[in-house]
Amino acid sequence: METNFDYLKKEKKFSSFANVAISAERIIIMDPEASIINSRRAMEFAIKWMYSVDSELEMPYRDNLHSLMNAEDYRQIIGVDLWKRMDYIRRCGNNVAHSSKKMGRDEAMLCLENLFIYLDYIAYCYSDVYEEHQFDPSIIYERIQKEKKSKEDSQAIKELLVKEQEKYAKQEVDLQKLIEENASLKQELSLRRKEQQPSYVPKPLDLSEYKTRKLYIDSMLTEAGWLEGKDWMNEVELSGMPNKSEVGIADYVLYDDMHRPLAVIEAKRTCVDVSKGRQQAKLYADILEQQYQRRPVIFLTNGFETHIIDGQYPERKCATIYSKRDLEKWFNLLSMKTSLKHITVDKKIAGRYYQEAAIKSVCQSFGEKNRRKALLVMATGSGKTRTVIALCDVLLKAGWVKNILFLADRNSLVTQAKRSFVNLLPSLSCTNLVEDKGNYTAHCVFSTYQTMMNCIDTISDEQGKLFTSGHFDLVICDEAHRSIYNKYKDIFNYFDAPLVGLTATPKDEIDKNTYEVFELENGVPTYGYDLAQAVKDGYLVDYVSVESKLKFIEQGIMYDDLSEEDKD
């Protein structure tokens, strides 16, 4: 049975993923969802293979698919367009596993095509001798036609494919073992990829076909928990448009349980078309607002790049379309929201003048200045955590936030922060994802960056994925600096929430790029309170230098003087 992936079998080094890819194509006629699962597995195995043979790819903290795909060095190597193709495969695989919506041949075929392009890239960069191949869907369509005409040996083939599927469903790739097996190839293949990659011509994302574009957008909606035909409607006819027919067709409208519109989605072919879609979507939103006395949120998307217009902040990019509960929460908060101009800070939590000033600066930034990022630079010991707890208290009472995410890079900082929140804001439900496994529904979530990266793609409930892009209304980043952002920027790009960064690094020593991350002028944080001022105010004491001599520096180390343990 010929497939598009047979060429991979010519090189033994591709064996860890070649057979799974072949199986994904062979089973597409009989079971499209099994084909999608195999496409996802083949992609995961191929990614792990790349990590095992390329010296520029460092193992992330976890070797699951989400972590491997989102590592910054990996994304830089494969490029944006190819990563987006791969993300479609990942998303469809998740939808098969977690969604009630059936995936069909169209989705499976697009997964196969995207997988083919990814594996062709691997062959181009790492093959001994590269031969150009094109994905040929006619091979599959001919097989479909043969199946329709003759069923003589179809039962035997089906039995063979079922056994094959069962075999690959149990197969796993041990990344550490793969690294050890491919150690001898690493230098040679890393060099080959560096030589080959510059001449690789990426296959452009073809979103001109409405059908193809819709598959990408539908997968995004399904992953967010929307149900087609129930709370997600396609091609909704709206009367009252300023055209000859006075009728317009909204590509998608998303509804709540009372069938009130939550969002309107305008799907366009390219990013260039977004401006056209923007005006059209605004007209649709105007009509729906007149009918339901509530203006829906607007999303503009081509399946890869998505923009949101919520009427509160300027139009911005967002990672995905919101889930139903994200949008329902957003409207509930909108109905409770009050101005941040005249706030009252709980002095039992943060009673010092500079803490109150910091909170008011952030509120002014979020409110009057209409910004979504703030950076607080406060000396160690001046009460950054108390300040941010009091800020959360203000924003909760003003109806600006419901769900809060507190991120830190060490378990100890996460534990300390949660303890302080519980003591000072006892009415706020809190959970530490590092320790409290299973308690995911608290309104204030504390986590390391690594743990949250893993939870985004793995935690779900009866309504679908839990940590969707609109789940949190405020993200707090402890010890915010450029290196943290670079390493985990996918978290900040994924969650569409206002961001508050905390750091004790003196404002004139903070990397210029950190200010750029928070969209601030270099050297000008949202609020700063330095050590010198804290000492002057009597809240902190200055450091004292103590001179001392070190034996190692003064006299060096003699091997004969070392203990037996140190000698080893």
Report the location of each language-model feature.
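Interdomain helical connector at the RecA1-RecA2 junction of SF1/SF2 helicase-like NTPases
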Residues: K512-D568
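ATP-dependent helicase/translocase motor core
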Residues: D120-N403, A408, S412-L428, Y440-C444, ...
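A short beta-strand-to-loop transition that corresponds to the Sensor-1 phosphate-sensing loop
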Residues: N302-G303, S447-T451, E479, L502-P506
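Short acidic low-complexity segments
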Residues: C430-G438
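Conserved G/P- and acidic residue-centered "switch" motifs that form tight phosphate/ATP-binding loops
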Residues: G104, G381, D478, T503
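Amphipathic alpha-helical interface elements
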Residues: M1-Q165
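Residues immediately C-terminal
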Residues: L413, T451, E479-S483, D490, ...
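SF2 helicase catalytic motif II
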Residues: Q463-G501
